[in-house]
């Protein structure tokens, strides 16, 4: 994405110190689950959720940020455990947020497969990818 403008959200107060490192990158002190903060930012072609890693936090962040994905845009939840049956059961909940017609898929990451293969009982990790229609 050589022409991208990147906006980062971070709840840490010192995150804004990263501003000015590049002209097309800005960092805003904001919790991605805070709808009043996010509403001031506009809409985006591509959103990556690499924040809180619990299922509840990822659901909450998706619910807050999804309305700001432009039509044709992508929303990626990074570091999602392959919850298997839980993920399938969660489809009804996800559909309430993103709509029934929204395509999404789970993408296992090679790095995670390598890392978790040596840890029995640890689920494989990946990314959950949504495309706004």
Can you describe what each PLM-predicted range is?
Residues 1-133:
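S-adenosylmethionine/decaboxylated-SAM
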